[in-house]
Curated annotation (Swiss-Prot):
Membrane disposition: Single-pass type I membrane protein
Broadest EC class assigned to this enzyme: hydrolase
Species for this entry: Sclerotinia sclerotiorum (strain ATCC 18683 / 1980 / Ss-1) (White mold)
Name by which UniProt lists this protein: Pheromone-processing carboxypeptidase kex1
The enzyme's E.C. designation: 3.4.16.6
Record-level GO cellular component terms: membrane; trans-Golgi network
Glycosylated position list: N440, N448, N500
Top-level taxon in the UniProt lineage: Eukaryota
Amino acid sequence: MRSLTTKTSSALLTVWGLLSVSLMPSVGQADKTAGDYFVHSLPGAPAGPLLKMHAGHIEVTPEHHGNIFFWHFQNRHIANKQRTVIWLNGGPGCSSEDGALMEIGPYRVKDGSNGPKLEYNPGSWDEFANVMFVDNPVGTGFSFVDSDSYIHDLPEMADQFVQFLEKWFALFPEYEHDDLYLAGESYAGQHIPYITKAILERNKKPDAKHKWPVKGMLIGNGWISPVEQYMSYLPFAYEKGLVKKDSEKAKKLESQQAICTKMLNENGGRDKVDNSQCEQILQEILSTTQSKGSDGNMQCYNMYDVRLKDSYPSCGMNWPPDLVNVTPYLRRSDVVAALHISPEKRTGWTECNGAVGSAFRAANSKPSIQILPELLAEVPTILFSGAEDLICNHIGTEELISNMEWNGGKGFELGSGTWAPRRDWEFEGEPAGFWQEARNLTYVLFYNSSHMVPFDYARRTRDMLDRFMKVDIASIGGAPTDSRIDGEKGLETSVGGHPNSTAAAEAEEERLEAAKWNAYYKSGEIVLVIVVIAASAWGYYIWRERRQRAGYAGIFGGDTPMALAGARSGSRGAAGLEDFRNKRNARDVEAADFDESELDELHVRSPTDDMDRDRYSVGSASDDESIGKRNGNGKGKEKSYS
């Protein structure tokens, strides 16, 4: 019996030891606090106070070493309430660091003299909202998982994302009651609706301690309805003049479109997220329209911005240009350390992971267009499109809206025979696009923009976001941007014009710098006046001495030591004063207008006062316009919508 007990104890200890080893990563994760994720410094960041940010991994599947990476930026200012935006890029398998460093994040990566450096993004979305970029699903970007454990379907991805949020909010409970917005582009048009649905279902469970208040979805150039998107390729090519209608090229493309239509109408084709025969339409457009460039090499249209050309068969895979700086920046060892990248992440950052995209076939998933109507009953949504994108073009988005029934109507129908108007949008005096809305859905078309709208027009997308979130700066001050829809300004939204925004801070610094030099200049004038007065007094003194000495000379004779000394002094004094007068005549300070109040101002705001003055937070929003991802057709034939 004792032997059996000993063996049993030994066996239990062995089992416990194995369990302890297997649970070690989870325990390590559980022991982490928010402070462990705090980013203390960021290589290449602009001078001044660093934005408040957290970054790192949250473990979601310990048994497969599955970790999701996030990069969270705290809002710079609060308008009337706390808001959090979660941003997702597409692919599937493309990193949301595209969004962080090329689109809506606070920084853009530029080429510096000593390597990549960060500059403030004039239209970053973190002015009045916390913004979190998530590399989703596992295996994407800085996220990682065992290579045999990639995600395959949309519901599985959404459930894992909710699990990530549960753990994230446990670490950062102060954000759990924020108004929550899910935003992204391209294939995120599948991810976002599925995640939103999973959150709404989670909120209805009795064991949900806190309901997460989902207030909106924003999807740019979204891959939402494959049917409408496939059928839009040829009309878009005609509209943009890529292919001439009734030409031989057009006939070949129409033949491929007929094959696609047949596939969609058979064997549940309309219920599939991807269809290889239909994707061939896009391939044929890019192939049949290729031409020889000035360098003698073949080139094709950039599928993300048809105003541009790229080498064939890349056709946009070398775009956007910022990528040449972003990739080496995110692979720097000091950046990896600053963002708390786990040593378990053994490979460097890549924009799009082909293995993740290959695994994520969504073979058992329905396209998100089929769940969008039910979501619109609860969640306000914006669909926005860049007018020059081919791969997820605006015609496809407009068609899916026209064909969709939601909230008691079809398309943008307002009533019998009436439709929601397209309202012209003007931003800072330029035509920016149009807005159209009905029954909880808003559609925005951005003129002259690509697949990655925020890359082109970050400030305009920030204006769109602030309008959608109903940010109103009237009560907090600041200069609103001049943004008008059908000539009406609506709520006062700020795009880098808030008193504490980056642009405002930069403008304030320029103003202070000018004031400082103005103060120095005025100080110089004052010194000059003092010198003139002193010189005049000295000159008067010398003149009086000469007069007196002249009198002494008349009494004592001209050869006395005193007379000679007086003559030499007088000569030097007169010559020196005359020279000074000649210089002074060029600019008579005393004769110039002089405002005594300037002396008071100089006293109030001296150069040292300016240096001691508290600066505004460096990293508020700023101002400027500044593109998306990724059909992987040029990369191993894998399609990736970023």
